[in-house]
UniProtKB/Swiss-Prot annotation:
SUPFAM superfamilies noted in UniProt: Adenine nucleotide alpha hydrolases-like
Record-given protein name: Cytoplasmic tRNA 2-thiolation protein 2-B
GO biological process: protein urmylation; tRNA thio-modification; tRNA wobble position uridine thiolation; tRNA wobble uridine modification
InterPro entries named in the record: CTU2 (IPR019407), Rossmann-like_a/b/a_fold (IPR014729)
Organism this protein belongs to: Xenopus laevis (African clawed frog)
Protein localization: Cytoplasm
GO cellular component: cytosol
Region Disordered, annotated ranges: 196-215
Keyword check for Iron-sulfur: no
Residue spans of biased composition, Polar residues class: 199-214
Main location as per UniProt: cytoplasm
Length: 512
């Protein structure tokens, strides 16, 4: 019997292997399967491309946030997801596309090499690769360095007025009727307006590359290094980088006239962000941070068309259709698992996904059910009710029995500086280290008295998560000037409002 078993074992193994290799596509039922996305979801190469393209355009179509002829900025990082997003937009704008995308795209790449500790020579090498890739897309592109945050205006932290748009269906119908009435001449003109600009025209791409990829001033580079050096933890550095990147994207979008910004976060990335943001105290803003449309900025909306794709699907698409991402070192590259909350969460979710394939999809579906309930119409238009850094609605207006109030009380009791209002009022006009004495000799402990008085007024304008980020910074003076100026502006407005409060009419009095 043993000999018979040994004789038949190779045949049984070959039969199982032939059966697994002989799977056919679940869609066309004809071609052999080239990949397996999930258990039972086998696709051939052509059907997988059709499935991938359909999901992208269906995501944009069912949400109906991009109007015909609208300018959309594509946030490109060189990674797999944003590279696949750019390819989808590029193919959707071609003349042969069955359901053509009708918006006007532009691409933005932000050079974050200084924050990641890269030299200018290393950054130049990456920028040359980025520029060559973007030139092949024939889409207008912008390449800026992160150092430009030190030249941003304070208005970038102010919420813009949202544009009143007509009904989406009526706008599309009007656009199609206008196309038919204008005939062939109108169609060709519209195609020229919607067709992406040819970057290969003489001097166009070279001029853009030279103007956007020039070396930033050394003063700004040193300031950026000092800013990230002041953050004591990698968690705070990653949060700070995300905040500065968002401010720069918002400024470029407003300056160049883009009303929408596309980012390339995948389903896997958003699932990781869901858990990490809860750990970072951003649970109140999960619908904004993980939803399809983020409208916190008012005049510019952040949309995430790649949120339906897993990282596995994106990797398959890039592999089969020659989409070449560019590897760029990040802050957590070669870092240990416990180096930051974000990196630890990423390792945890990826390992869990390997053993339980429904982990990412479960987290993603959970995030879809979350809605923002703390914003009302009055708070949306009030700048003082929004965080100074992330521009999210403040989540610090909690009751005395809340966990936030308990945390604040514990923090105040643990401080060496007395928190009495009378003491703060008496010492508000005094300079630090008066009489030649140090702060420690003056009875204030090891903390500088001037910073102790300035920090509460600044922290009061931040949400709970941004307060934790600022708490991990050694100094607030290294922040960009537009942040400090906006904080001072809000303080002055608050003081002015207190002075004229008794002369203001309340809403009830006005209605009566």
């Amino acid at each position: 019997m043993c000999e018979e078993g040994e004789t038949y074992c190779p045949e049984v193994k070959d039969a199982k292997q032939a059966k697994s290799l002989g799977k056919i596509c679940m869609k066309c039922k004809e071609s052999s399967a080239a990949l397996l996305i999930r258990a039972g979801d086998a696709f051939c190469k052509s059907c997988f491309k059709e499935y991938f393209v359909h999901k992208f355009r269906a995501t944009l179509g069912k949400n109906r946030v991009i109007y015909p002829g609208e300018k959309v900025l594509l946030a490109y990082s060189g990674g797999p997801s944003s590279s696949a997003m750019v390819r989808q937009v590029q193919e959707g704008l071609s003349r042969d596309a069955p359901k053509k995308l009708r918006f006007v795209p532009g691409i933005l790449f932000i050079d974050e090499g200084t924050a990641c500790g890269m030299s200018w020579e290393e950054r130049q090498q990456i920028l040359s690769e980025i520029c060559s890739v973007l030139q092949q897309t024939k889409i207008p592109f912008h390449i800026v360095s992160l150092e430009q945050v030190f030249s941003l205006p304070g208005s970038v932290l102010q919420r813009g007025a949202p544009e009143q748009r007509p009904n989406y269906k009526e706008e599309v119908d009007r656009f199609l009727v206008q196309e038919r009435e204008q005939g062939d001449a109108g169609c060709s003109e519209m195609l020229e307006r919607l067709e992406v600009t040819d970057s290969d025209s003489p001097g166009s791409s070279d001029k853009m590359y030279q103007s956007t990829c020039s070396r930033p001033p050394d003063m700004h580079t040193q300031k950026l290094k000092q800013l990230f050096a002041s953050a004591k933890t990698l968690t705070a550095k990653q949060q700070l980088l995300h905040t500065l990147r968002s401010h720069l994207i918002l400024h470029i979008a407003r300056t160049c006239g883009y009303s929408k910004v596309m980012t390339g976060e995948s389903c896997t990335r958003l699932s990781i962000r869901l858990l990490s943001n809860v750990s970072l105290g951003r649970g109140a803003f999960l619908p904004l941070d993980t939803g399809f449309c983020d409208s916190r900025y008012g005049d510019v909306d952040i949309i995430r068309p790649m949120r339906e794709y897993s990282s596995k699907e994106i990797a398959y698409y890039n592999r089969f259709f020659n989409v070449l991402p560019i590897f760029i070192p990040a802050l957590d590259t070669k870092a240990s698992e416990n180096s930051s909350i974000q990196h630890l969460t990423e390792v945890f979710v990826n390992r869990l996904q390997a053993d339980f394939p429904s982990t990412v999809s479960t987290l993603y579906r959970t995030s879809e059910k979350l809605n923002v309930s703390i914003i009302d119409a009055d708070q949306e238009t009030c700048a003082k009710d929004r965080c100074l850094l992330c521009l999210s609605p403040l989540d610090t207006q909690a009751g005395k029995a809340s966990a936030f109030s308990a945390t604040q009380l514990s923090h105040h009791l643990s401080q060496k500086i007395p928190m009495k209002s009378n003491d703060l009022a008496n010492n508000s006009d005094k300079s630090c280290c008066q009489g030649g004495q140090g702060c420690k000799e003056a009875g204030y402990g090891d903390t500088c008295q001037s910073r102790a008085l300035q920090t509460p007024s600044f922290v009061h304008m931040l949400c709970y998560s941004c307060r934790l980020t600022v708490k991990d910074m050694q100094s607030l003076d290294v922040l960009p000037q537009y942040v400090l100026h906006e904080a001072e502006y809000r303080c002055h407005r608050t003081e002015m409002r207190k002075e004229i409060q008794e002369f203001l009419l309340e809403e009830d009095d006005g209605d009566s």
